[in-house]
Each structure stands twice: as C-alpha cells, then as structure tokens.
Amino acid sequence: MMELLANKLNRKYIGIDISEEFLEISKSRIEEINEGQLELTLDFINIISIDNTNEKILIKMEEDMTRKEAKPVLKWAGGKAKLIPIFEEKYPKELIDGKINTYIEPFIGGGAVFFSMLSKYNFDRVVINDINSELILTYKVIKEVPEELINILDKCQNKYNDLKNLEEKQLYYYEIRDKFNEAKGKLNYDIIDDKAIEHAAYMIFINKSCFNGLYRENKKGGFNVPFGKKEKLNCYDRENIMAVSQALKNVIILNGDFEGIIEYVDENTFIYMDPPYRPLNASSNFNEYSKEPFNDDAQRRLSKFFNELNEIGAKIMKSNSDPKNTDENDEFFDELYSNYNISRISASRSINSKGTGRGKVSEILITNY
C-alpha cells in the first residue's frame, strides 16, 4: 500500500511520521507535490490503508506498533500465560518456518496460548472449541458485539462498587449468579441477541467477583462458586475486550466435544490441547468446567483421538497434570502416550479450591514431533 502511494508521488519510498506534529508537515508536503490531487485524511485508530477510489488516495494512520495485544478476558483454571515462554521452545519447527496453515485449540478455556499464538504467527484458518456453552457464548458475544457487552458490564460494575458494604455486594453477587443459572440451558446459544449479551456479561461479572476466579458447575449444571468478598471490583478492560474482539474476527468458534475439530485437521495443522487436568488429589479436582466430568475414561478417549490426529499428520502438543507429583509410581500418562515425546516442566498453581497450597508443581507436555 505504501508502495502505491510512493509511485503516485514518483518516489522510491515514502515514510510516515507517527508524531502528529511532523505528520501534519508530511501531509502538507504531499499535498503540495501533487497540487491538490491527493486528499489526505488522518485517523489514528485505523490501520494504515490506501483507497484509490475516484483517483483519490486516503491515508489512515494507526498506532499499529503499539496496539494492545489481546489477553484472556476470563480467569480459568489451568491458565497457561506463565508457561508460554517454555511452550515457545517446544513448538514444532513447521510453525516457526511458516508451514502451518491451520491452528486449533479443542479446549480453549481462558485462551492465553491462543491469543499469544495469534499475535506471533499467521494462519489461513484458526479454530477454537470448548464443551462449556457459557464460555463459548461469551467468546461469540465478544467477537460480534463487544460494545454492547461492555455497556452491560459497566452497569454491573458500577452498581457493585456503589453498594455500601460487603453484605450488599454479596446479595448483588448472588442475584446475578441466580439470573445466570436460571438462563443456562434456556438460551439459543447460536443466536447473539439481548439475552445472550446479558448472559455473557453475567458470565464475566461472576468470574471476576466469585471466590478465587474459579468456574465450577454442580451435577445439575449450575454455577456454584461462592462470593469472592471483593471491596472494589474491576471486572473488565475495555481496550482488551476490543482487542479480543478483533483477534476473534476470522476465528471459527465451535461448542462441543473435542472430537468435533477433526473435520478441520490436515497435515499442515498444529493443535494445542489443554484438557481438564487429571486431579492430583481430592482438593485439586478442578475439572468440573461442565456438569459432565472429564474422568480417566475421557482421558483415554482423548489419547485415542490424539493417535487419530497423529495418523492424519497434524502436529500436536498436549498439556496435563503430572501424577508423579503425588505418586511416583503413577504411570497413567506415560503409558497412554508411550509412543510420543513426554517432557516435564515446572508450573505454578494459580487456582485452588481452598486458596492454599499454591506453589511449584510438575506438569507434563506431550508432543508427536
């Protein structure tokens, strides 16, 4: 695009100043050179672009180098933000060489790896999936109508912070939680209407105001995490929601079982799997992201699916807890994935049902390359 403008000005190249003062000087010079033939407009929130319609060139400036990188909107058990530098050392060579066309996450969760991946690599196709319908609806709402979502979040946050004491805030939290649970299962999760937008806003609100940022469902499918006792609540970042909306713009968003991604997989695909972790003990049982438990049978089914994807030729990286943290003789994953590469990395617990016991633990990373 800049080459097109340079040709118009009979120049080998052209530079654009970020400073508004010097940009105005550059604008004047360009207009003088072309004797009024170019119409230049400045808009510091849009990407640099050139529109040659009607023989007029419109230049729109964006602070592209400093724009906010999308980050997770929700706090989610097993978040991987701190492990990304380690993961980057484990990525397949084909990804680094630009030979991966499709990127897929069948267990999107909070999406830390996903957002990092989109900020550093280009793909022809990106697919995310999760079995949690509330989570996926929230991503769809952010993608389609971020401003409407922010408006509701702002009202919820302001009302919460205006309440006089924790007793009133607690009542308001449970009021929103009850509304959230009442709507679950009654919504059409394929339609983004006012009810869906409100539901997504409530999802974010209770995620930020509940105890320890934990998402947990009971056997009936109801969100059952208690009040987090926060004096002041900051439940959203406007800039980040807009950045996430932009990141999701061309992403295929699925809501279902992990095996549903297979139609998008070929030999030029990289898949990162971050399934609900196998609990290390009773107090770390945080795989209740939906009313259907992700037990050892589900882990075995996932390992068979891993084999199937491997046969297609996809590159796969999978995370999980390391049973050897509590039982050195537990070979569960070592046996399931004995034909693949298994490495152990150090990680910090960020969510615990009791808010205690946080510290360094070993996690496993399985790759087929």
Descriptions of predicted regions:
Residues 1-16, 26, 87, 103-117, ...:
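Conserved proline-anchored active-site loop of SAM-dependent methyltransferases
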Residues 335-369:
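Class I S-adenosyl-L-methionine
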Residues 8, 299-348:
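Conserved Class I SAM-dependent methyltransferase catalytic core
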Residues 254-256, 346:
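Short loop/edge segments at beta-strand edges and connector loops
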Residues 15, 23-60, 120-249:
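Class I S-adenosyl-L-methionine-dependent methyltransferase module
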Residues 237-252, 303-316:
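A structural motif corresponding to the C-terminal end of an alpha-helix
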Residues 222-231, 277-299:
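Mobile active-site "lid"/loop adjacent to the S-adenosyl-L-methionine
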Residues 40, 50, 55-102, 107-108, ...:
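S-adenosyl-L-methionine
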